[in-house]
Amino acid sequence: MPNDRESRRVAQEVVVEAITTHTVWLHRASSAQVNRMVAEFDELAGELASKLAERLDNLAPAELAAFSRGRYTTDRLKGLRNLIDQWAESLATAVTAENAKSLEELAGYEAGFARSLVADAVTGAVAAAPAAAAVYESAMQQPVLGQMVEDMFEEVPRRTRSIVYSQIRQGISNGQTNQQIIRALRGTKALKYKDGALNWTRNEIDNLVRTSRGHVSNVAYENTYEALGVEEVVDVATIDFRVTKYCAGIDGRRHKVGTAHPRPPYHYRCRTVQAPSFGANIMGQRPYVKAFKPVSQIPKDQRPDDMIGQVSASTKWPQWFARQPASLQREWLGPTRYELYKKGGYKIERFSDPLGGELTIAELRARDRETFERLFAEAS
């Protein structure tokens, strides 16, 4: 590892610039994986909708009433139940198989990236990265947000199956036509199926794919850092207004490798990563985005000149935020938290709990009633 001040400075600069650029690639790669899995789900949902429409049309009114009460008393009702159950099993196979393959490939790539990251920052020989299979197995044996990755994905088909049953039963009870039931379940093509009950599954696939990939990446980094003798890591959050208050508050926090400490992902869709620290202040440049949604969703003619730029990599998120216009600060914090921040002396990290959850206004008031009474009594 670097052993003089200038070498540490250069090493830290190389590392932070490389890892912040890499996280952009990771987000795009995750988007591609989400798109593949959602497209596969949409195909399965289309097949289900077609078969359901045919089956429902063949049911007598008495059979529809029985289905709504959870009774499968005829061959046609049993056939409908089997159709839904088998479809849910097909969904489970598709989701778990596709994601497992993707995560194992990612594990190997990320371990290689972490090794290259350290190798480019230091002089001398660097050990080989852990094998992809070993990293993947390690990630599967570690919880992410308190759950195992496999369990998180197994819940998707179970919940989706429940949604299908519930939507059909509710539709029958409400007197909807079969066509209306199918439309409410799947949604409409004109709205890209976002108006259907099954949009929950599409969103959950998005959430879990991004979260599980973030988990595998960070396990790959940690295993590789430890194998290479890195002693300390630092949390590196994304500098934009999409970041959560928890990640904004812990940007720059350091941890000893090989000890029990908090690890990303800190929440669903978390973009924070842990970079190797060489005992020096973080140097170089890191990008920022003054936006509350992805840049790709903002028309070019609506992007201010200073919306995208760079700051010193040693700048922590709260320091960057303190220099932003009051209008942006208020929008990100909300009016009450903004007053606490500007006049109550609150730091960003005070708006979240130790587990990463954002504290509600009521919880903040209960914790610091004196400040609330002073600030908001003055305002009234």
Model regions: which residues?
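N-terminal leader/targeting and assembly helices and adjacent pre-domain segments
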Residues: 1-191, 285-380
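Acidic, glycine-rich two-metal-ion catalytic cores of nucleic acid-processing enzymes
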Residues: 182-185, 191-290
